[in-house]
Amino acid sequence: MTKRFWNIDLEEMMRAGVHFGHGTRKWNPRMAPYISAKRKGIHIINLTRTARFLSEACDLVFDAASRGKHFLIVGTKNKAADLVSRAAIRARCHYVNKKWLGGMLTNWSTTEKRLHKFRDLRTEQKTEGLNRLPKRDAAVLKRQFSHLETYLGGIKYMTGLPDIVIIIDQQEEYTALRECITLGIPTISLIDTNSNPDLADISIPANDDAIASIRFILNKLVFAICEGRSSYIQNS
């Protein structure tokens, strides 16, 4: 994998608050190598380490995108949800930003059936087929469609397991991470000072609560994916 320059600026990270960890009482001792100081009761993340692992993650997704690989971005908490959907749409990735349904990956056959149902209902909705049904039947199917759209809308074009999963807030998305580990799917995780850095393939230590911090990390990864996709198209 070729190392590239991704213009990851420490001052820009500081302005985004990437360096602010959780309170010192709420930490995982395994994060000690990624913490540079304590300040006013919170841990300060070592941004040099953040830059290093973010750069490695950008190299990985660029390389994967340049070979036509598929990505899934997961981030369901309120502060991350909109950022995740926008980033995924920009980079033409699949995403989950509402709720991780247990077994979404490990029980892929069931997820696939739900997706087929969702696509069928979506077609009916577009062609106004639901309006030709009796009102009660149409209402039931419309509710079902709305439910599926909420939870599966971001993966509606997924036809198989993703090649790489990007996780925003490892603690929040632990179930998704465990499924990836079970299936051997490479993972990139944004981890705060309360996380275990040894679980994901690449762990990026960063503030997972501040919108500006999440946006900074996602923007770098999305840029690398888009660059990789451009390379793939040029070489096809």
From Swiss-Prot:
Species annotation: Aethionema cordifolium (Lebanon stonecress)
Alphabetized, the UniProt keywords read:
Chloroplast, Plastid, Ribonucleoprotein, Ribosomal protein
Say which family it is in: Belongs to the universal ribosomal protein uS2 family.
Q: Can you name this protein?
A: Small ribosomal subunit protein uS2c
CDD domains, A to Z = RPS2
Q: PANTHER family, per this entry?
A: 30S RIBOSOMAL PROTEIN S2 PROKARYOTIC AND ORGANELLAR, SMALL RIBOSOMAL SUBUNIT PROTEIN US2M
Q: Which GO terms describe its molecular function?
A: structural constituent of ribosome
Q: Which GO terms describe its biological process?
A: translation
Gene3D superfamilies noted in UniProt: Glucose-6-phosphate isomerase like protein, domain 1, Helix hairpin bin
Q: What's a Pfam family this protein contains?
A: Ribosomal_S2
| A GO cellular-component term linked to this record | mitochondrial small ribosomal subunit
Q: Which InterPro entries match?
A: Ribosomal_uS2 (IPR001865), Ribosomal_uS2_bac/mit/plastid (IPR005706), Ribosomal_uS2_CS (IPR018130), Ribosomal_uS2_flav_dom_sf (IPR023591)
- Where does it reside? Plastid, Chloroplast
| Keyword DNA damage annotated | no
